[in-house]
Curated annotation (Swiss-Prot):
Keyword terms of this UniProt record: Lyase
Protein name: Probable 5-dehydro-4-deoxyglucarate dehydratase
Metabolic or biological pathway, per its Swiss-Prot or TrEMBL entry: Carbohydrate acid metabolism; D-glucarate degradation; 2,5-dioxopentanoate from D-glucarate: step 2/2
EC number: 4.2.1.41
Biological process terms in GO annotation: D-glucarate catabolic process
Enzyme class: lyase
Length: 304
């Protein structure tokens, strides 16, 4: 059981690599809880600093709120002792508040607040949204800046001042100037998480901006390689990092970019390659075809 404060949990998250497991489905797209639980146990053999259940890689956007709670509860119960499990909240403010409360009831150790659904919002609106979610839970909240919820440094500073349990900022934009402004303004008040697809591509320059960790989707199917990459990054072994980028990460991203939505689909394909299948992706995503799967298998062989 974890009894640490939100700030202590955020510090732990920032000290190592973050696991973002896929969500397992049966052939009819139902949640396969038994397979999911088994996989959380398998991932627990490797040294991640946090587990983000039902996040983007876990197809949050295709899960119902009750399914999200079911996934989070399973992750909490199967994760190794001492490993923080972070749950998602999203959609409109009322739903996000409900999801944050449900996550806390399920035993989660923190909240990742994803962008609101299907609408643009002003900075004032985004600030109000985050404040309501933070007020609804005692858990630490990390905001995910991306898509229709890109937070300015002024908005993040206001939230950091107003919400003691705002503990993290996850960047899914890739705007170096914006990230520099936020880090320069807030320093170690927050834990900074890299959240662009295949975050390993951006890890080297982002480390200089205080982004000490990131969501590793490839950790799902090449966990040791993902950890070796992260440890090389943090120890300053840039030669290893560059070789790994050229040997695996860049060609992997080329394959990922062949179709929209493959950032998630390719992860489940990777699990199929290593004989740990997680089932299909739910529509509207599509699975890789046989040729693409073979290409991915060749890449995985290089780093396994």
């Amino acid at each position: 059981m974890i009894t640490a404060s939100p700030q202590e949990i955020a510090h732990k998250l920032g000290s190592g690599l973050l696991s973002f497991p896929v969500t397992h489905f049966t052939d009819d797209h139902s949640f396969d809880e038994a397979a999911y639980r088994e996989n959380i146990g398998w991932l627990g053999q490797f040294d991640a600093s946090g587990l983000f259940a039902a996040g983007g890689t876990g197809e949050f956007f295709s899960l119902t709120p009750p399914e999200v709670e079911q996934v989070v509860r399973a992750a909490v119960q199967e994760a190794p002792d001492g490993l923080p499990v972070i749950a998602p909240a999203g959609y409109g403010t009322a739903t996000a508040v409900q999801m944050a409360r449900s996550a806390e009831s399920a035993g989660a150790h923190g909240i990742l607040l994803l962008p609101p659904y299907l609408t643009e919002a002003s900075q004032d609106g985004l600030v109000a949204h985050v404040k309501e979610v933070c007020a609804a839970t005692t858990l630490g909240v990390t905001i995910y800046s991306r898509a229709n919820a890109v937070y300015t440094e002024a908005a993040v500073a206001e939230l950091a001042d107003s919400c003691p349990n705002l503990v993290g900022f996850k960047d899914g934009v890739g705007n170096i100037e914006q990230m520099t402004r936020i880090y320069a303004s807030l320093g170690d008040r927050l834990t900074y998480v890299g959240g662009l697809p295949t975050a390993e591509m951006f890890a080297l320059p982002y480390l200089a901006l205080g982004v000490t960790t990131y969501s590793s989707a490839i950790y799902n199917f090449v966990p040791q390689f993902a950890l070796d990459f992260y440890n090389a990054l943090r120890s300053g072994d840039n030669a290893f990092v560059v070789n790994a980028l050229n040997d695996f990460v860049i060609p992997y991203c080329n394959l990922r970019n062949k179709k929209q939505g493959y950032a998630v689909s390719i992860i489940k394909a990777g699990m199929k390659v290593i004989d740990r299948p997680a089932g299909p992706v739910r529509p509207p995503l599509t699975d890789l075809d046989a040729v693409e799967l073979a290409e991915l298998a060749d890449l995985i062989k290089k780093v396994s």
